[in-house]
Amino acid sequence: MSQSVLHLRAPALECVRIALIGLGSRGQKTLERYRYIDGVRFTALVDHSLEHLEEAQLILERSGRERVVLATQDSQLALASDEVDLVLICTDWYSHATLACAAMEQGRHVALEVPAALTLEDCWRLVHTAERTQRHCFLLENCCYDPFHLEMLARVEGGDFGELKHAEGAYIHNLQGQDPTELPRDHQLYHWMGECYPFAGGNAYPTHGLGPMAQLLGIYRGDRFTSLYACASTPGLPLTQRHSTVLLQTERGRTALLQLDLHSPRPYSRLQSIVGTEGYMSKYPLPILQQRAWAQALTGEALLEELRTRPRSPLASFVAEGDAKGVPNVMNYTMDARLIHCLREGLPLDISAYDAALWSAVIELSARSEQEQHPLSLPSFL
């Protein structure tokens, strides 16, 4: 019988040896991010393009790292290498699950870009492979490392909001180009949600909003999502032009709202709200923290300054470290540094294979719910 990987502790790694698969825009940006991360060494690079492989080598050189000997167009060579501990997967959406499972079968830990999978079948495949191999399957969901979210999570875990009732999350980002009827054709989301996308509706990009909400609600850590209902305001339009709304309910009776909107002229927002019997906190559109006992809410820059100067998150040291290093994006740095820290110390990861599967499963389930026009049950991957 397979063992759970929810709190998996793998042997500590003195130096994490990394294979990076996928050296397009996302992969090259990942290499650039890792110039700030200690305790790692890149031992394999994989891409179909020889030009991308050379560009990646130059990025490593500019960041003071050695060129990689194993630079190949064949991912299987990298996965089979005994010089690899962790495989970073930055390829197209459709290959994430297959590459992740192949890496775990070879005994490698995996960190993959969002989403982890597009279908329920592949979500289950990730979970079963992680359990059988006892390897980490980490989802690179950087919004779970937003300093604001980390401080919100610390206050939830500290009981500041009383009994939780409701959470909201989203990815609201106007990506339309000069032609208001479509996204710019060179934008990544245009391709990811294009002709090969397997579903006609639903929320195709759920993890930025759902991941932080799941952590706040303690999903798989005391509660679980049980049902989902999805609808779209403009179902006749192409997927990138719709407004998707998903409502979820948990076993303990809490609710969650998840939205995706890539086309309307709304300001950027991930909502990031939590409601409890004793308080409320939200990042967008204006940061606000309200406790029942307070006469006045703490808002805007005053709240952000409070969170910066009196942090309560156990991950605050990573945020401070990123600030001190002057990293371009402290959210990404915190995610990367925390992942490597846990692998080097033999600690459980913050995001498990079960989380990666559940957050990604909403893609297919929301599409089915929207099409069938009724709620659906969510599987418990744990």
Which functions belong to the PLM regions below?
Residues R41, C342-W359:
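Glycine- and charged-residue-rich phosphate/anionic-cofactor binding loop of Rossmann-like
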Residues S2, L8, A12, Q178, ...:
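Contiguous beta-strand/loop segments that form the cofactor/metal-binding neighborhood of enzyme cores
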Residues G22, T133-H136, C143-L237, Q373:
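Predominantly a Rossmann-like dinucleotide-binding segment in NAD(P)-dependent oxidoreductases
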Residues L86, D92-Y145, G159:
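Beta-strand-loop-alpha-helix segment that lines the small-molecule cofactor/substrate pocket
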Residues R67-D74:
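Conserved SAM-binding strand-loop segment of SAM-dependent methyltransferases
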Residues T43, V69, D85:
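Conserved acidic residues
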Residues A357, H374-L382:
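C-terminal lid/capping helical subdomain adjacent to the catalytic/cofactor pocket in oxidative enzymes
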Residues M1-S63:
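N-terminal Rossmann-like dinucleotide-binding module
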